[in-house]
């Protein structure tokens, strides 16, 4: 094997042909050599012909992966519920539906809160994107998309725009105005273009950049104003279904999950995957950062939710019961991080004690599978969307 570095070339005698030429440092079996460009290319080609076949490289990758898992296992000396034994148990938990938002003509697929803690944007299989007043249940804006299955929507941090997309393979941004009679579609701005459906989108900490996830197996960071691709993220082996941006104070990272059963943490500046977790047994439908940014939760079609500690670099808790046989479609934390709300395909919302791993409540009300769920910015309520065409605000 050989690895080439990007150090500045120097002039001297080549260790291969011994001619005085511009040299580049090359590592061969961990030994540093100085080769001219011609010899370096010949050596790389010979190495590939001799033993660096695709099969051998895959074998080496699997070997390294096994060693990594062994090192992780050495650090696995305690479980979260054991540490939490001395933590006081939660008291009586009471939440119920306070508002029901009706207006979509088909399955609600996604929703997001505005930072003003009052307005909600939702998208549906009927091709509509609606902005709601969650206090009065009034519809403030409505947009008809050119395609059905609007699978992603997001509110801009300023509250002055929304983003949405789905089977049209692109992310569109609509500015919001006080004039409710204004034609919003005329001001539409197409920002992101993928080669397959758009599954999720999220503004960064400003209105100027947006993250997208797609069925083409990639995530991407875009400039909203110019529509320029700023960074692409490749690493998933199948459709990417969800993403979540880390809390602003923890740095430029985000987590994604997909049909390859992987949850991957990405550095937005370099475009590189910095951590990956593969403990789920089926598609990962939802990921959400813990409020501190030190961990994240995931919900999967394997009927479990899981908690991953980024500092320990491993899974630390599984939230499941034998009676739960349907997949988890959406997850989110309470503002304190003590509770994990999870929507399931059996029409229920389960509330989990994050520390103790126990279920503290089951919320009933939806008449079809729960497809999306988000806690309000102030933590006083959460909203769920369902295939029963409605959204419910719980408190």
Curated annotation (Swiss-Prot):
Keywords: Disease variant, Intellectual disability, Membrane, Repeat, Transducer, WD repeat
Regions crossing the membrane: none
PROSITE patterns tied to this protein: WD_REPEATS_1, WD_REPEATS_2, WD_REPEATS_REGION
Predominant cellular place of this UniProt entry's protein: membrane
One GO MF term: protein-folding chaperone binding
WD repeat placement: 103-142, 145-184, 193-234, 236-278, 279-318, 320-362, 365-394
CDD domains per the UniProt record, alphabetical: WD40
Disease listed for this protein: Lodder-Merla syndrome, type 1, with impaired intellectual development and cardiac arrhythmia: An autosomal recessive multisystem disorder characterized by delayed psychomotor development, severe intellectual disability with poor or absent speech, and bradycardia and/or cardiac sinus arrhythmias. Additional features include visual abnormalities, seizures, hypotonia, and gastric reflux. Lodder-Merla syndrome, type 2, with developmental delay and with or without cardiac arrhythmia: An autosomal recessive neurodevelopmental disorder characterized by speech impairment and variable expressivity of attention deficit-hyperactivity disorder. Some patients manifest developmental and motor delay, hypotonia, and sinus-node dysfunction.
Subunit structure: Component of a complex composed of RGS9 (isoform RGS9-1), GNB5 and RGS9BP; within this complex, the presence of GNB5 stabilizes both itself and RGS9 and increases RGS9 GTPase-activating protein (GAP) activity. Interacts with RGS7, forming the RGS7-GNB5 complex; within this complex, the presence of GNB5 increases RGS7 GTPase-activating protein (GAP) activity. Interacts with GPR158; promotes the GTPase activator activity of the RGS7-GNB5 complex in absence of glycine, in contrast GTPase activator activity of the RGS7-GNB5 complex is inhibited in presence of glycine. Interacts with RGS6.
Purpose of the protein: Enhances GTPase-activating protein (GAP) activity of regulator of G protein signaling (RGS) proteins, such as RGS7 and RGS9, hence involved in the termination of the signaling initiated by the G protein coupled receptors (GPCRs) by accelerating the GTP hydrolysis on the G-alpha subunits, thereby promoting their inactivation. Increases RGS7 GTPase-activating protein (GAP) activity, thereby regulating mood and cognition. Increases RGS9 GTPase-activating protein (GAP) activity, hence contributes to the deactivation of G protein signaling initiated by D(2) dopamine receptors.
Protein name, as recorded: Guanine nucleotide-binding protein subunit beta-5
